[in-house]
Amino acid sequence: MKISAVDQSPIFSNTNANSAIRETIELAKFCDSIGMHRFWVAEHHGSDSFAGCSPEIFIPSLANETSSIRIGSGGVMLMHYSPYKVAENFRLLESLYPGRIDLGLGRAPGSNPVQAGALAYGSKTTGPEFFTTKMNDLKSFLIGENAETEAFESVDVTPGLGSLPETWLLVSSENGADLAAFFGLPMSLAHFIEQDCLHLVDRYRKNFKPSVF
């Protein structure tokens, strides 16, 4: 069995965010040293409890401090961001650390409404209702095809195609399981959030559509 870990960089009593970040680095190094398979970091904003706010910034530091364990996001909250920029960030990470990068995607905001608004900064295409559109375009940008959004059909993504990051969807609901199955994505099940969720595995397998992922 392959054992993996996700760390939210918790800020414990009498410590601070800087200490939490350093502890995550040490934990990643330990997980690598005992042969674990993956190590993911989370995205939370404006939190007094969790220090990890930017997986795409944290990932290269962790990859540089380790030797073989896969490093990834658990996850990037796609509702806030441009699929184009997410694709470029993670294709660049995959170029730097080939065969070791995971792009875990989340559908939750990872923030309160005020912080979500600050992340959007006036954009009209944020929110969970845009996830399917953004996921379609992200898929196209990752694999080097024309985006489904007509305005972006001619957009090229750098760096050029090589190996792709493994792309996952974080799931804690039936809707999430359905989306993972529809897009043919590996599913990371949030059993620590929803204990009664094993039925989602059967639902996912029943509806799964194979894809490039």
What are these regions (language model features)?
Residues 33, 124-157, 196-213:
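An alpha-helical appendage that flanks or caps ligand/catalytic pockets
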Residues 175-193:
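A conserved active-site cap/scaffold subdomain adjacent to cofactor or substrate pockets
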Residues 2-17, 79-145:
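Flexible, glycine-rich active-site loops centered on histidine and acidic residues
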Residues 20, 24, 55, 86, ...:
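Aromatic/hydrophobic pocket-lining residues that form the small-molecule binding cavity
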Residues 3-7, 39-41, 71-74, 101-105, ...:
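Hydrophobic faces of well-ordered beta-strands that scaffold small-molecule active sites
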Residues 1-66:
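N-terminal beta1-alpha1-beta2 module of alpha/beta enzyme domains
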Residues 45-54, 79-84, 193-200:
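Acidic-and-aromatic substrate-binding clefts and catalytic sites of carbohydrate-active enzymes
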Residues 32-33, 59-68, 94-101, 181-182, ...:
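Acidic (Asp/Glu)-rich catalytic clusters
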